[in-house]
Amino acid sequence: MAKISKRRQAFAAKVDRQKLYAIDDALALVKECASAKFNESIDVAVQLGIDAKKSDQVVRGSVVLPAGTGKSVRVAVFAQGEKAEQARAAGAEVVGMEDLAEQIKAGQMDFDIVIASPDTMRIVGTLGQILGPRGLMPNPKVGTVTPDVATAVKNAKAGQVQFRVDKAGIIHATIGRASFEPAALRSNLSALIEALQKAKPATSKGVYLRKIALSSTMGVGVRVDQATLAAQ
């Protein structure tokens, strides 16, 4: 732990918390700070100009990152008949109906995302207290309740990330791994920012994207100059 603290302190000394770094410089710093023995995730925190306490200003959605997330995702799908076959063909690891619900109730949840066809919500709806706290409850706002389950599975496998603003008005998301090339991280960040812009509430006033900061799992936050991101 002491070594980690010393390493973190050394990286913190390299980063000016008050400075806005050009996107390329920010990514270089973040990748340099990602020196752990595992392939650290590269995360972004975006401070939004919204009032998260107001229901009409809750920002939520999903986006497929063009360079993927660097993570292998296991998908469970509630579907039957032809849609079940389509889900399996698209690569879903687990497909079912009441049998899948029973597995979940028994605590057997070896998957990272749950997708549901609308006609299965009578079953899925009974699992809210189990799936909800784990962030697994299907929701049409993030594309996980859809009649096109095959596309939803493909998107999940291709690197789709879900986002939802927290109580402080901040969006937290992972845009890749430390092993990614800077260009891949840049394209993923741009895709996320574009999705956030599209999800801007009509009632949001003033500056919408207030602050953007990047960090690695074990690193420190580096603030990004948004003008340089827009110039990419």
From Swiss-Prot:
Highest taxon of the lineage: Bacteria
Keyword NADP among record annotations: no
CDD domains to which the protein is assigned, alphabetical: Ribosomal_L1
Alphabetized UniProt keyword annotations: Repressor, Ribonucleoprotein, Ribosomal protein, RNA-binding, rRNA-binding, Translation regulation, tRNA-binding
Alphabetized InterPro entries for the sequence: Ribosom_uL1_bac-type, Ribosomal_uL1, Ribosomal_uL1-like, Ribosomal_uL1/biogenesis, Ribosomal_uL1_3-a/b-sand, Ribosomal_uL1_CS
SUPFAM superfamilies linked: Ribosomal protein L1
Record Pfam families: Ribosomal_L1 (PF00687)
GO molecular function, one term: tRNA binding
Cellular component terms (Gene Ontology): cytosolic large ribosomal subunit
One GO term of the biological process aspect: regulation of translation
Record-linked HAMAP family: Ribosomal_uL1_B
Function statement: Binds directly to 23S rRNA. The L1 stalk is quite mobile in the ribosome, and is involved in E site tRNA release.
Family as reported in the entry's similarity comment: Belongs to the universal ribosomal protein uL1 family.
Quaternary state and interactors: Part of the 50S ribosomal subunit.
Protein known as: Large ribosomal subunit protein uL1
Species: Burkholderia multivorans (strain ATCC 17616 / 249)
Gene: rplA
